[in-house]
């Protein structure tokens, strides 16, 4: 069931991110800080929803997810003047660590275990994220191929969800 949950979550976030790519391209959205912050908050609303749903604490996941998105986007914009688009990788890794802590808060576990899961998610998903980064650092001259985007985004999210979900309880054992 854990593998199925991780794959389902990765496919869902792959679809969300592909829809985001479509909106950016179709409506010629310019990359500005406010558009990036909005994008991060919406993406993490969905990711928080996945974590919250799995923990049977959907509303809490939906509330905290966008805050994590804003934090990760702010980290990106703080690092971007120095690292350019390279700042996306540490921001991506930061949000996995934050989502591991959210999962711990919503379920059971210790901060140390959550940080360990978050670091594993950050490194593995960060590597996958780096491997797909060409979809926007070297865009297709004919425009985005949304099937490829969906596959790539799903691939990038899968290691993170596996790290968070494998051998982790789905519910909090106490009242939260």
Q: Which residues does each predicted region cover?
A:
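Juxtamembrane/disordered regions of integral membrane proteins
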Residues: 1-176
